[in-house]
Amino acid sequence: MIWIMLATLAVVFVVGFRVLTSGARKAIRRLSDRLNIDVVPVESMVDQMGKSAGDEFLRYLHRPDESHLQNAAQVLLIWQIVIVDGSEQNLLQWHRILQKARLAAPITDAQVRLALGFLRETEPEMQDINAFQMRYNAFFQPAEGVHWLH
């Protein structure tokens, strides 16, 4: 009889946990599926943001607009390069990921401010983010003799 109660309690706990976290998992999966990556980098970023900023990011990501998904991808890019690993190889890898997802675009000042808001608990240096912004946006400068069609 005790085993039945323990099994029932375990099932209720697991189902309750899944129901309570379904919105967060859905928002994280939306970004990771679009980028065709594992959910671990997105979950790690949300965890490092802290409780309030992480919840704000998930609410922001839960909005249905494509622009919100674009901005969330840019925040993930900023976190990956400025906070996690600023190597050239990592930058090129994430640029390719964004290109494949059709989310590669120059980082705007508004996206930098958005990232600073979400990443406020990690206290990124503004000059590091600005240097990264210039470095990343150089990918979108026309090469000599090449003109982009918009």
From Swiss-Prot:
InterPro entries: DUF1198. It holds the Pfam family DUF1198. This is Uncharacterized protein YicN. It comes from Escherichia coli (strain K12).
